Amino acid sequence: MYLIFDTETTGLPRDFKAPITDTDNWPRCVQIAWQLHDGMGNLIESKDYLIQPEGYDIPYEAEKIHGISTDLAMEQGIPLKDMLIEFKEVLGRAKFIVGQNLKFDTNVMGCEFVREEVENDLQEMPVLDTCTEDTAALCQIPGGRGGKFKLPTLTELHQYLFNQPFGSAHNATADVEATTRCFLELIRLRNYSSIQLEQSEKYFTEFTQTNTSSIESIGLTHLNLKAESKKIR
């Protein structure tokens, strides 16, 4: 099964190469969303949590991006450890973790596991990323390093695959839904190899027979977190 997830955080690390044990370096997770799908793309589980800030405030610069204020996270969030235990459980049901530029999210979550001393297999999970040289070659957007095509943003990839904009970035639920749609469409278009997916050629035939046309969104309702934060001020 495929576990697609995304986080919103308090900001960026000082050093992107720092280990996840460097708890002073990595930002805090203030929202996580995930979807678990079976091999044919069927939705098994969808979850979304705000995380109560414990011992820190969400910087206003971060709030301006994702809309999650400290007050909103305290009022509507759950304790970090509760989320980590549930996330660990769903990790155990997945074969792959999937995301857009996923290394950042795995490091953020890995560091949160370290902080709470929760054992987990996140760093050992096989990764399928939607932001790669393969998707860069697919979208063919100029401006990459060394004359290469640039790595596509989620918005750019979504626009290329479905010829429609995606304007809800920086809400983890919306980002996960868009990433999931792109990921499953990339399977349908055979942008991933049988080796990458650890499948036989028969898998792609079954997948395209199950998904005969472009992948559709599952139609989740995404809260306007900026509006929610304003309500409680």
Regions found by a protein language model. Name each.
Residues 1-3:
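Extreme N-terminal starter segment of soluble prokaryotic enzymes
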Residues 7-15, 20:
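Short acidic, Gly/Ser-rich segments with clustered Asp/Glu that frequently serve as metal-coordination loops
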Residues 8, 23, 112:
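Acidic-residue sensor for enzyme active/binding pockets
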Residues 15, 26-68, 88-232:
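Metal-dependent phosphoesterase core characteristic of DEDDh/y 3'-5' exonuclease domains
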Residues 20-26:
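Short consensus segments that form the blades of beta-propeller domains
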